[in-house]
From Swiss-Prot:
Cited function: Nitrate reductase is a key enzyme involved in the first step of nitrate assimilation in plants, fungi and bacteria.
Sequence segments annotated as region (Disordered): 1-51
Keywords per UniProt: Disulfide bond, FAD, Flavoprotein, Heme, Iron, Metal-binding, Molybdenum, NAD, Nitrate assimilation, Oxidoreductase
Residues reported in the UniProt entry to bind Mo-molybdopterin: 169
Documented EC number(s): 1.7.1.1
The protein's name: Inducible nitrate reductase [NADH] 2
Organism: Glycine max
Residues binding heme: 552, 575
Quaternary structure (record): Homodimer.
Taxon lineage: Eukaryota, Viridiplantae, Streptophyta, Embryophyta, Tracheophyta
CDD domains found in the cross-reference section: cyt_b5_reduct_like (cd06183), eukary_NR_Moco (cd02112)
Length: 890
């Protein structure tokens, strides 16, 4: 709803602009604008030269390290398919229209100036496809000289102003309001804010050149209208208005902007020209500006009345329509209010508590802003619910204009002791401006969910990031859009459960919890940790997954490895929405914390008990005898990266040390492990099969293909875990969990599949890409045993010859051992003399290179699902293989 800064509605096209063409054409705008007169210092600091240099430096610092925008596949089939966008932006309203904000850590990474590709976007419809050469802006209404200006006239015939300004959507932080009660707006997070350097023509200069009438002749309002065709009100442009006094006020720095951060505007941000009204909400800054109309009355546009209002809390949408609240002038939003947000610690950040971290201060950071040009004078942080406040250091590189106005956010930071954080229940922030405005402690709901500026609170809890140490995990109130997470979301979940179950006891108040008639303690859940009774905990709910063991596509181990534990992070990291819906069928009750005790190293005790003391003493590590095997299905084990070798431009060999140099890994042949890492503040878990022998002591090796971002158009961001691994310095520690999988090769042709024995004398082994690694382990195990006579026929498919992993080892084994045959298939040959197949796995290739179907032949496969579904299974069936019983998929 809230019309926000960088975005105005952009539905249809206007004034002869044609419908969008096929994807991929160049954006119809000049890469550089024609030479224009230097900007005036009309209302800037008198130090014009210093200011210009400072702006260039700010732009340079703020726009580095930004990946290229792409034609996002999510825009395919929409009228915006021709626009390149940054793939990291969080989409808030599905595919279309495009409304988005950057991830909060990405926004803050760039500091004071926001790169244009990361600037938040508010669009009501499709983006107009504009051309600089034929775009005009009409000034009409109560003026003596109505004029239609071309872009060249705006550029060359008028002085320009250039200055930094922060744009904020009136809906910034709306999702917090939606957690209390659903508003009529979508879920903006805390990053509906961005700062750019804007350049354009002063509005007052343009109006005076057209001879704006005096107040006595009725010129009381200045209306703005965009180019889009929108559905609101039965069909309209996007339009709004401001008072004449505001429009002509030289201290306001209102401009018709045609440049952002030194470049022409981008399509999402209003190309070729838009309004910039510093200190106002984004909803007044019309993009793709076509008309300026001087009128006696305020704008009659549908969006001027039905958007950007703060109505009293008792007014819902029905009452607002019935009693015409939308048309009451007292509730319109113009200037921004005071606001502040904590950005560091970020959501789900974990701060380990150890001898090193407790000796160092921790920096809490964030941003603050106010409206109307009012300076932010003070930011305070509390760790004790407002009993005491610590004053923050402000970083405000902006200089005021010569009227003393400030148009930009400020960044703030404060040092706190780690041990003080350990004893805190939450961190909260509030800001003050020069008018002594500050933020309310509690949220005040309104039907549009706008101008939310209550204290921003980050919750803290004690966790155990690694065996033997504790840490603090931080939780923001919400995550933007439809993303899950945030302490407010969990509290809302609990509240809904309480409403559906009036018998819920108030003492059961964990924010993770949703209660039914049955509750269980942690100690009860721990007892259900085997194939006879496998319970898990996800977000405080208890699930009995016993009857799903045999049906889990990842095998029984995938459940048993977490049975009897809280596996919320692991479940969220690797399961789809469909899987999450399926899980509800197995829900049997809720976890209660009223009888919680921390008698196990796997528990995550909280310091937020009912007393005022901090019960840290129960957090103890139980010393257990040294194990000869490192892997433990119930625990993650920390493993240190000790070497990294580049095999090719995108293939790496990683060696990780086990927790002790006298340990075996303990991974059965055919099973795999999970690598666990926090990437971009989210838990990432990926399955890998080590390539080192299961008999190696003290370490394991992984051969990993790195999927870099920007290489494959279908996966513009690349592989999350593989890129993370590639970036790790030597000495980094990752968590490993396992063993996982339902297939075990026990030797001499014998397998255990879902715990049931299988036997084969011949194996058809079909691999694709990185799916060679489990096949490789089985091959190694067979060849290592001179009495294992199992025949192996490997068909290994890849895109190119360069993509083939472990080729040297496979070829060497094939030459040395008669019982191993290897055949390669690549999609395209890049050199002459390629002696293997080109194309895809086909019936003819399998006929020639794998054994005939028989009772003592098994097919093993691992690779991309499309390969297995469309190449392996149908072609094996053509050869007479029983794929239901004799095809084993890793």
């Amino acid at each position: 709803m809230a019309a926000s800064v960088d975005q105005r509605p952009y539905p249809g096209l206007h004034n002869g602009v044609v419908r969008p063409l096929k994807p991929g054409p160049d954006i119809p705008r000049p890469k550089k604008l024609p030479q224009a007169p230097p900007p005036l210092s009309d209302s800037s600091s008198d130090e014009e030269e210093d200011t210009t240099l400072n702006l260039k430096d700010l732009i340079r610092k703020g726009t580095t390290e930004v990946e290229s925008s792409i034609f996002d596949p999510r825009d395919d089939g929409t009228s915006d398919h021709w626009i390149q966008r940054n793939s990291s932006l969080v989409r808030l309203t599905g595919k279309h229209p495009f409304n988005s904000e950057p991830p909060l850590p990405r926004l803050m990474h760039h500091g004071f100036i926001t790169p244009v590709p990361l600037h938040y976007v508010r669009n009501h419809g499709p983006v107009p496809r504009a051309r600089w050469e034929d775009w005009t802006v009409e000034v009409t209404g109560l003026v003596t000289r109505p004029t239609c200006f071309t872009m060249e006239q705006l550029l060359h015939d008028f002085p320009s102003r250039e200055f930094p300004a922060t744009l904020v959507c009136a809906g910034n932080r709306r999702k917090e309001q939606n957690m209390v009660k659903q508003s009529i707006g979508f879920n903006w997070g805390a990053a509906a804010i961005s700062t750019s350097v804007w350049r354009g023509v002063p509005l007052r200069t343009l109006l005076k050149s057209c001879g704006i009438y005096t107040r006595t002749k009725g010129a009381l309002h200045v209306c703005f209208e965009g180019a889009e065709d929108l559905p609101g009100g039965g069909g309209s442009k996007y339009g709004t208005s401001i008072l004449r006094e505001v429009a002509l006020d030289p201290s306001r720095d209102i401009i018709l902007a045609y440049m952002q951060n030194g470049e022409p505007l981008s399509p999402d941000h209003g190309f070729p020209v838009r309004m910039i009204i510093p200190g106002f909400i984004g909803g007044r800054m019309v993009k793709w500006l076509k008309r300026i109309i001087v009128t006696t009355d305020q704008s009659q546009n549908y969006y001027h009345y039905k958007d950007n209002r703060v109505l009293p809390s008792h007014v819902d949408a029905e009452l607002a329509n019935a009693q015409a609240w939308w048309y009451k002038p007292d509730y319109i939003i113009n200037e921004l209010n005071i606001n502040s947000v904590i950005t560091t610690p970020c959501h789900e950040e974990i701060l380990p508590i150890n001898s090193w971290t407790t000796q160092m201060p921790y920096f809490i950071r964030g941003y603050a802003y106010s409206g109307g040009g009012r300076k932010v004078t003070r930011v305070e942080v509390t760790l004790d619910g407002g009993e005491t406040w610590q004053v923050c250091t402000l970083d405000c590189p902006e200089k005021p204009n010569k009227y003393g106005k400030y148009w930009c956010w400020c960044l703030w930071s404060v040092e706190v002791e780690v041990l003080d954080l350990l004893g805190a229940r939450e961190i909260a922030v509030r800001a003050w401006d020069e008018a002594l405005n500050t933020q309310p402690e509690k949220l005040i709901w309104n039907v549009m969910g706008m101008m939310n500026n209550c204290w921003f609170r980050v919750k803290t809890n004690v966790c155990r990031p690694h065996k033997g140490e504790i840490g603090i995990v931080f939780e923001h109130p919400t995550q933007p859009g439809n993303q899950s997470g945030g302490w407010m979301a969990k509290e809302k979940h609990l509240e809904k459960s309480s409403e559906s179950n009036p018998t819920l006891k108030k003492s059961v108040s964990s924010p993770f919890m949703n209660t039914t008639s049955k509750t269980y303690t942690m100690s009860e859940v721990r007892r259900h940790n085997n194939a006879d009774s496998a319970w898990i905990i996800v977000h405080g709910h208890v699930y009995d997954c016993t009857r799903f063991l045999k049906d889990h596509p990842g095998g029984t181990d995938s459940i048993l490895i977490n049975a009897g534990t809280d596996c919320t992070e692991e479940f969220e990291a690797i399961h789809s929405d469909k899987a999450k819906q399926m899980l509800e069928d197995y829900r049997i009750g809720e976890l209660t914390t009223t009888c919680y005790n921390s008698d196990s190293s796997s528990s995550n005790p909280s310091v937020h008990g009912s007393s005022d003391t901090i019960p840290l003493t129960p957090i103890k590590e139980v010393i257990t005898p040294m194990r000869s095997v490192a892997l433990n299905p119930r625990e993650k084990i920390p493993c240190k990266l000790i070497s990294k070798t580049s095999i090719s431009h995108d293939v790496r060999l990683f060696r990780f040390a086990l927790p002790s140099d006298d340990l075996l890994m303990g991974l059965p042949v055919g099973k795999h492990i999970f690598l666990c890492a926090t990437v971009d503040e989210k838990l990432c878990m990926r399955a890998y099969t080590p390539t080192s022998s299961v008999h190696e002591v003290g370490y394991f090796d992984l051969v990993v293909k790195v999927y870099f971002k920007g290489v494959h158009p279908k996966f513009p961001t690349g592989g999350i875990m593989s890129q993370h691994l590639d970036s790790l310095p030597i000495g980094s520690v990752l968590d490993v969990k396992g063993p996982l999988g339902h297939i075990v090769y026990t030797g001499r042709g014998n397998f255990l599949v879902h715990g049931k024995p299988r036997f084969a004398t011949r194996l058809a082994m079909l691999a694709g890409g990185t799916g060679i690694t489990p096949i490789y382990q089985v091959v190694r195990a067979i060849l290592k045993d001179p009495e294992d006579c199992t025949e192996m026929h490997v068909v290994y498919a890849n895109r190119t010859e360069d993509d083939i992993l472990l080729k040297e080892e496979l070829d060497e084994w094939a030459k040395k051992y008669d019982r191993l045959k290897v055949w390669y298939v690549i999609q395209a040959s890049i050199r002459e003399g390629w002696e293997y197949s080109v194309g895809f796995i086909t019936e003819s290739i399998l006929t020639e290179h794998i054994p005939n179907a028989s009772p003592d032949t098994l097919a093993l496969t691992c690779g991309p699902p499309p390969m297995i579904q469309f190449a392996v299974q149908p072609n094996l069936e053509k050869l007479g293989y029983d794929t239901q019983n004799n095809l084993l998929v890793f």
